[in-house]
Amino acid sequence: MPNRALITGASRGLGLALARALAADGWELVVDARGEHDLRAATADLGPAAAVHAVPGDVADEAHRLDLAAAVDALGGGLDLLVHNASRLGPSPQPSIAMYPLEELERVYAANVFGPLRLTQLLLPCMGPDARIVSITSDAAVEPYEGWGGYGSSKAALEQWTRVLAAERPDLCVYVVDPGDMRTQMHQDAFPGEDISDRPLPEASVPGLLTVIEGDLPGGRYEARTVVPAELATGVAP
């Protein structure tokens, strides 16, 4: 039976790049994104229909989270990997924290903190020993960048509950991974009107993510572009 992963936010950017890499390695995938058309178009070339299960919806929505859990349960055999990649930036341009609309902040936290936590709660029963959970974070979670109070604080909260989960569930492999700046639509939205063509494509962060997913690294926080290659992490020669 192939390994099975659930990746949120897989219609573009890092989520899609990771989905492509895992599909190429023979993983069975359950993927989601807010836009149904974009999700199905993006995942059409990932592999046989039986190996890629697209479930469109918003991770901030409880009904959608239940749909994702039901999709995994219907496949049988449990879940080997859960990647919390979907996220919401918030207003663009990003407001100062003193002027941040609380209703917008609630939406950011619903997508970046509460949604992933609730999805984890729903999926833990089908994750066996050594299953992996990866929460995608940002340097804005640890650095006080002006204008990043909403998104950054939500990623800090995501990191903290992920690390607490790692302490509470030592039978699982739980990671926080910062992919670094990437040439994505979200990054462009964070810097409206600026040229971001010097940022690496999301694919540049995938090898490091695969090291975390397929290697033997201890749980913790990693930067995707600075982790060692997977064959070195596992001690297997290339």
Show where each model-derived region lies.
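Conserved glycine-rich cofactor-binding loop
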Residues: 11-12
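Conserved glycine-rich Rossmann-like NAD(P)H-binding loop of the short-chain dehydrogenase/reductase
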Residues: 25-42
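The beta1-alpha1 cofactor-binding region of Rossmann-like NAD(H)/NADP(H)-dependent oxidoreductases
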Residues: 56-68
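Active-site Tyr-X3-Lys motif and surrounding loop/helix of classical short-chain dehydrogenase/reductase
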Residues: 67-71, 93-99, 103-110
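Catalytic loop of short-chain dehydrogenase/reductase
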Residues: 88-89, 96-102, 117, 130-157, ...
